[in-house]
Every structure is written in C-alpha cells, then in structure tokens.
Swiss-Prot record:
This is tRNA-2-methylthio-N(6)-dimethylallyladenosine synthase. It is an enzyme of class 2 (transferase). One of its GO terms (biological process) is tRNA methylthiolation. Catalyzes the methylthiolation of N6-(dimethylallyl)adenosine (i(6)A), leading to the formation of 2-methylthio-N6-(dimethylallyl)adenosine (ms(2)i(6)A) at position 37 in tRNAs that read codons beginning with uridine. The keyword Membrane does not apply. InterPro entries: Elp3/MiaA/NifB-like_rSAM, Methylthiotransferase, Methylthiotransferase_CS, Methylthiotransferase_N, Methylthiotransferase_N_sf, MiaB_methiolase, rSAM, rSAM_horseshoe. Belongs to the methylthiotransferase family. MiaB subfamily. [4Fe-4S] cluster 1 binds at residues 20, 56, 90. It comes from Leptospira interrogans serogroup Icterohaemorrhagiae serovar Lai (strain 56601). Residues 381-449 form the TRAM domain. It catalyses: N(6)-dimethylallyladenosine(37) in tRNA + (sulfur carrier)-SH + AH2 + 2 S-adenosyl-L-methionine = 2-methylsulfanyl-N(6)-dimethylallyladenosine(37) in tRNA + (sulfur carrier)-H + 5'-deoxyadenosine + L-methionine + A + S-adenosyl-L-homocysteine + 2 H(+).
C-alpha cells in the first residue's frame, strides 16, 4: 500500500452503542473489522474521524435518542467537514433512507448484515459520495471468523445466532435482523477457548431466540455440552430465549452441571391467551405456566426473570388482571416491564389500533411494577441465610469497599471487601457468600472464611 493510500484509509473510529447486548457484541465486530482495515479506535468523539452510532429500534424513545444525539454532533461536522457520521444497527435497518430526510449530519446508514462493507463505504464518502445507505438482509451472514473482543472485566458476550423467525406482531426484530441463522458450533467453541485464555471466567450466549440455536446436527443443548466439554469456562449464561424452545434435555443439562447457571429469562409478554394470540407468541397462558412448572421441577433453585408489555392494542382491564394473576402465580425473580408503543413496520402497527389510552397504560404499568417489586423483595428475602458460590465480577458501583457478583440463579449480590485484601486480586475469584439482608434488587452478604 502506498503512503497516499494509507493516509486515505487511516483514521480514528468512535463507536457509541445503544440497546441490547447483541448491539454491544456487534460494535465489537465493527471495531474488529475497522482495525483489520487499518483504522484505529477512539474513545473520544471530539478527536475522531469517523463516528458510528450503533442503534436500537425496540422502544419508541430509542429513535428520539438517536435523533437528539445526531443533532448534538452537528457542531463537530461543522468544525470538521471531513468527519464521517454513520448510523448502524436496527434503527438503520428499520428506517433506511428515511434517516437522510431529517436534516441530520449523517453520511452513512448501514444495517446489521452489512458491516463488512463499512471500510469501502467510508472510502466512497471520502471520494465525494454522500447519503449512502446499505440495508440488505442476509440469509447467511454470521460474522463467524470475526473476533469482536466484547469483554467486561472477567465476563464476555458471545453471539451464537442472528435473526428471528417468530414475527411477533409487536416486534421489529425480524425486519431489522432478518431470519434466524446459527454460527458454526466449532467457531463458537474456538471463541470461548480464546476468551478463557484472555482471563474470561463467565460468558453470556446471545441470540434473538438463543435457545432456537440449530446448526448442522447441534441444537442449543448440544452446543452447551460442547462448551462444557471442550472449554474450561467457569460459568455459562444465556439470553434471550423463547418459551417454546425449552426441551427437557436442556433443563436436565442445567440441573446436572453447575457451570451452566440456573438462570432463565422467560419472556411472558402478557398473561391472557387472547392477547398472546394477537401478539403471535405461539403459546397460551396455560402452556407458559406448564413450561414454568417443568423448569422448576427439573431445576428447583432456578431464577426466572421475564418481559411484560402492558396496554397492547385492545387489552381490556380484565385481560390486564390476567397478567397480574400470572405474575402472582409464577413469582418471577425480576421483570422488565414496558408500556406498549407502536414500532414502524410491525404487524401490530399495520393491523391493530393503538387504542389503549396513555394514562391507562401508565396506570397499568405502575400497578404491575408495584406488584413485581413486592414479589422481587419477598423472593430475595427468602434467600437470607443461604450460602451461594459467587464469582466476583467487579467493585460495587456504590462503594469501593464493596464487591459484587451474581448468584448462580442470577441475583446481584454485594458484600464487603475483606480487610487488607487487594481488590484486583479478588475480581475473578469465586467465594462463598452468606446472605444477610435483601432489597427488591440486591442481596447483601458477607464472604465466609
């Protein structure tokens, strides 16, 4: 490569990530691709030649956040007209060229399946093109060989599949991420082996429907077994699954292997069968409760968390009460709870009226949050006196004299740093912690000698 070509390609890339862990992982993929193309990464947008916003499209406020952020970057574009600004991810895929009609300082719009093209697209911008959009969905792209290096201390995310085939009526993911395709299991094993060599002790496997993983003759349970057999990773977690894909042999594997953490995120979305049918969730209230019963029969000390939407189109007060009844019956450890908001391009937006008044949605959400907070507190209080094996993940955000980590069943736990102990030497170690008190969000305890 000539000096001139090197100068044209060189530059500092800043990536700002919004949304889920999958986006965090994808930002790692983009960083790796840009490094391979001889760009360097930057932690400062003010001192960068390229700014990427890796975006989310799941919630209504996600779009507003990005519009506001792009407007706030306008002064950098005025100061440096050669600055390249791109929107990546689900919002890019969802809105495409429409983003260029908003009078925003924007050069590139690139969907999740097109990140390999970023270096070439930047060169086209630098040669004078503008407003380039690339949002093709792929049936095969999994970025198998890319090393994203998405590491947080002693834990890391590993994407094992991309896309979704379920087409829930409220969800934009199948339209922004494409159809399901799974990575080669051998490439996943290699990635985890590499992470272990780098000091990673815990991984979280990612996918839009992570337990729908299927590649060659390997299903999700088979992949877990490979990771248990062929790597020394200490703890394996996963998110987000679908309730329809919990075969008995997967649960038995969890019950028999302490390295496969008994921590399941099981999205309910609604507790009324008619509403679930409108959502196209492919299970009834009774079928969901049967899945919960089987999980708890096979994995007694499991932690179960969930997602719930209130105010879905045509949801009546009685149907909302059904959701509250399911929450009381299941006793979730924790829940992510949201008011329904229309997402452009979804079946619900096209076919169903957003006809539950905003004040009713807000009242229902408040009622649900109050109920779940009370349940979470009781669930955590029931753990007082118990002893858990906890992998120390970090220093507590509230005090440098406190350490934190999660129980195998997923509850965040904080406990004092032992006197005359080096903090850095503790992070990544596994200790026995006795629980002494609890809030709705956190367990508090002490390390046993």
């Amino acid at each position: 490569m000539s000096v001139l070509e090197q100068e044209k390609k060189s530059g500092k890339v800043y990536i700002e990530t919004y949304g889920c862990q999958m986006n965090e992982y994808d930002s790692g993929i983009v960083s790796s691709l840009m490094r391979d193309a001889e760009y360097s990464t930057s932690s400062d947008p003010e001192n960068s030649d390229i700014i990427f916003l890796n975006t989310c499209a799941i919630r209504e406020n996600a779009h507003a956040k990005i519009y506001n952020r792009l407007q706030s970057l306008g002064y950098l574009k005025k100061r440096n007209p050669n600055l390249v600004i791109g929107v990546l991810g689900c919002m890019a895929q969802n809105l495409g060229d429409d983003l260029f009609h908003q009078e925003l300082p924007l050069d590139l719009v690139v969907g999740p399946d097109n990140y390999r093209s970023l270096p070439e697209l930047i060169q086209r911008i630098r040669k004078g093109e503008n407003s380039i959009s690339l949002t093709r969905l792929s049936k095969i792209e999994t970025y198998d060989e890319i090393e994203p290096r998405v590491v947080n201390g002693i834990q890391a995310f590993v994407t094992i599949m991309r896309g979704c085939n379920n087409f829930c009526t409220f969800c934009v993911v199948p339209y922004t991420r494409g159809r399901e395709r799974s990575r080669d299991p051998k490439s996943i094993v290699r990635e985890v082996q590499d992470l272990v060599q780098k000091g990673i002790r815990q991984i979280t496997l990612l996918g839009q429907n992570v337990n729908s993983y299927k590649e060659q003759d390997t299903d999700f349970a088979g992949l877990i077994q490979m990771l248990l057999d062929e790597t020394s990773i200490e703890r394996i977690r996963f998110t987000s699954p679908h309730p329809k894909d919990f075969p008995t042999h997967l649960l038995q594997l969890m019950s028999e292997n302490p390295r496969f953490c008994p921590n399941i995120h099981l999205p309910l979305q609604a507790g009324n069968t008619r509403v679930l049918e409108e959502m196209k969730r492919s299970y009834s209230k009774e079928e969901f409760l049967d899945v919960v019963k089987e999980i708890r029969n096979i994995v007694p000390d499991v932690g179960i968390t969930t997602d719930i939407i209130v105010g879905f189109p045509n949801e009546t007060e009685e149907e909302f009460e059904d959701t509250l009844a399911v929450v009381r019956e299941v006793q979730f450890d924790m829940a992510f709870m949201f008011k329904y908001s229309e997402r452009e391009g979804t079946m619900a937006q096209r076919k169903l009226p957003d006809n539950v008044p905003e004040e009713v949605k807000s009242a229902r959400l408040t009622k649900l949050v109050d109920l779940q907070t009370s349940i979470s507190h009781e669930q955590n209080r029931a753990r007082i006196g118990r002893v858990y094996s906890i992998l120390i993940e970090n220093i507590s955000r509230k005090s440098e004299k406190q350490l934190c980590g999660r129980t195998p069943c997923g509850r965040m736990t904080v406990f004092p740093l032992p006197q005359e102990t080096n903090v850095s030497g503790m992070i990544g170690s596994t200790v026995s912690v006795q629980i002494e008190s609890a809030t709705s969000a956190t367990l508090k305890g002490r390390i046993l000698a």
